[in-house]
A protein has these predicted regions:
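Donor nucleotide-sugar binding/catalytic pocket of nucleotide-sugar-dependent glycosyltransferases
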Residues: 66-111
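Conserved acidic donor-binding segment of nucleotide-sugar-dependent glycosyltransferases
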Residues: 236-248, 255-262
């Protein structure tokens, strides 16, 4: 509240994540709001998950959230059109909303993958350890394929304070699971290139940052077919999708990759390397942090009256 009191009428406030937006809106509730405010919703999060308690909470908070969002924000920015439609309808939002499909990635520090193995491919899931990220589906897949020509790795930590987070006892079970290699936290920029295939099994995403980083680095990616993955990464090479987080379909895709002619005749470095080069070019032209910051700057210019209108360059 101290921060909101110090704001001037011509300031622009840009808030990231729905949770932070609601906290800002609550702090802003009892002041005469003269600032221009933007909320970027990077994913709808726990409140819009399939968790029973979350569903009840969403109903109870509906009127309150509708009032907060409409009073406090001039612009809502989403990362996919399903989230846009869902939350605009829920909050009865009457302002302007647009799509900017990612927060962007900083590519300078990312170490690029140089070679692809043709046996004992390393599969990784790198994520916060919460239920809706598909952790247990990934464990089931690793158990199903424990005798295959793949090695399964899990990177990430439990998310303290998140009601959907795995418990310490569940994490201990993962550490003792012989089908999986638990890594804990890793430095994505320096370590991800050591793996061959990245799996994203999230049940919801605004936009998957790890997927974009993996495609830039050069990993082959298989993702659950949800708006937060397909809306962006369907434009890339070396990217495959599975409907409904189907474990058998993930297995089939992995087997198809290892049986690809490029692996069989040892030309995988050229085949997947060319796809990775294409991905890096596409990301450098459209989806780096610098490019996304430039897109937001156009919104700031519009709110300051420096340009007459704003239209998102992303479709």
């Amino acid at each position: 509240r101290k921060i909101t009191k110090s704001l001037n009428y011509d300031d622009i406030v840009h808030v990231y994540t729905l949770k932070s937006g609601l906290l800002f809106a609550f702090a802003n509730l009892f002041r005469n709001n003269k600032t221009k405010n933007i909320l970027t919703i990077t994913g709808l999060g726990y409140l819009f998950s399939n968790n029973f308690k979350a569903k009840i909470l969403k109903i109870l908070l509906s009127f309150f959230i509708t009032h907060l969002i409409n009073k406090s924000f001039d612009f809502l920015i989403y990362q996919n059109n399903i989230d846009q439609k869902t939350f605009n309808n829920y909050s009865k939002y009457n302002g302007e909303s647009y799509i900017i499909p990612t927060s962007g990635i900083t590519v300078k520090e990312l170490q690029i993958k140089k070679e692809y193995r043709n046996s004992n491919l390393k599969i990784i899931m790198a994520t916060r350890l919460i239920n809706d990220k598909g952790i247990f589906e990934y464990l089931d897949l690793a158990d199903l394929m424990k005798d295959s020509d793949f090695e399964f790795y899990l990177a990430g930590d439990i998310d303290n304070g998140n009601p959907d987070s795995l418990s310490k006892s569940q994490l201990d079970e993962i550490k003792n699971n012989k089908s999986i290699n638990y890594l804990g936290h890793i430095d994505i920029s320096k370590e991800l290139h050591n793996y061959d295939v990245n799996l994203v099994m999230s049940k919801y995403e605004g936009s998957s940052r790890i997927l974009l980083e993996s495609l830039y680095i050069g990993l082959i990616c298989i993702s659950n077919n949800i708006p937060g993955t397909t809306a962006l990464s369907s434009k890339f090479s070396n990217s495959f999708f599975v409907n409904d987080n189907n474990i058998q379909e993930f297995k089939r895709n992995l087997n198809e990759i290892i049986n690809n002619d490029a692996f069989l005749d040892s030309t995988q470095n050229e085949f997947f390397g060319n796809g990775a080069d294409y991905n890096r070019k596409l990301i450098n032209e459209n989806y780096t942090s610098v490019k996304i910051a430039a897109a937001y700057n156009k919104i700031y210019q519009y709110l300051r009256g420096e340009i007459e209108s704003y239209k998102s360059e992303f479709v």
